[in-house]
Amino acid sequence: MTRREMVVTTASTLAWLSSARLTGAEPVLKNMGGEGPGFANRSRAGGFDIVERCHDLGLGVVRVNVPQGGPDAVRGLRKKLDTYGMRCIVSVAPPRTDAAVAAYETSIAAARELGAVTTHASVTQRRYEEFDTFEAFKTSFEAHKKSVERAEPILRKHQVKLAIENHKGWRAAEHAAWVKQIGSEYVGVCYDFGNNIALCEDPAETYRLLAPLTLYVSFKDMAVAPYEEGFLLSEMALGEGILDIPGMVKGLQQRDPNMIFALEMITREPLRIPVFTKKYWATFDDSYSPLPGRDLARVLEIVRTTKKPLTTTAGLSPADALKLEDDLINRSIAYARKHLSL
């Protein structure tokens, strides 16, 4: 079956799933949420409200930004969340300068007013694309550390937490060491299940290091495939990739029975991870930020031995890409209902 045929044949399934939710046939997944990047095609189509969409899908949590419009807008969003019985995670970046501290505190106060379970920050880009030298990477990492130092007293004052995402900027060992060094109950990890594969980490090792520090999960399955300069990395519907989704979820729930798993099923072309290029290795240093050869070998073994068809939008119109996005999200939610206790 071609991708286009798959998109067309899923239309009736999507309609059934939507109607089932709207008629109350399925219970709310109180510990499963949605994040904006997973709805990118729907957002581009216009008229998108992430709270309404997550509610319609039967998700009990949503990641939002602080609304524009001041206190009235914040109160309006809180009222909507309360009406739907939903919780929220609020994206607020730590202050990069002393001059930004006051605005950051205003945003943290708004997050508290919204009843945020935690705030969220993904402050890095893909390090192998962003930086050409190790020195530039180190300067950036030290600046991010300083920004969280500025943020922590404000978080403590308002009793609001910050979950720092592993966003292809730091390997798990350095990320975990940093969070432990901060030593604050208000600073932890937003654990993205897939991102560190791009930094040549076995998902089991990422889990071992980040799970004990996790405040919430950016939830997805993943798959890999070879290409001439390295490997391709793609988000997949839950249960259709290479990750041990049931095992990872169970382990995190043993640590926190109310752990939130916010779905981020991004429907796009696979990412290119160019591990066979000189630029990829420019930011790794043997002592400050090591990437041992055995880790590269392990990831390449995973690439060689796992055969999964990757998510792709190549050749799809915007309308068909949106249909594929809806299908992948709905398949993920159906999997969670059947196999996970969320």
Regions found by a protein language model. Name each.
Residues 30-37, 62-64, 88-92, 119-121, ...:
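Hydrophobic faces of well-ordered beta-strands that scaffold small-molecule active sites
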Residues 44, 121, 127-130, 225-229:
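Short acidic/His/Gly/Ser-rich catalytic and metal-binding motifs that mark active-site loops
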Residues 16-21, 61, 82-88, 96-188:
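Active-site acidic/histidine proton-transfer and metal-coordination neighborhood
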Residues 26-27, 51-56, 70-89, 105-116, ...:
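Acidic (Asp/Glu)-rich catalytic clusters
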Residues 40-44, 64-74, 94-102, 129, ...:
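Acidic-and-aromatic substrate-binding clefts and catalytic sites of carbohydrate-active enzymes
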Residues 1-5:
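Twin-arginine (Tat) signal peptide motif
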Residues 7-16, 26-31, 45-52, 172-186, ...:
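Histidine-acidic metal/acid-base catalytic patches
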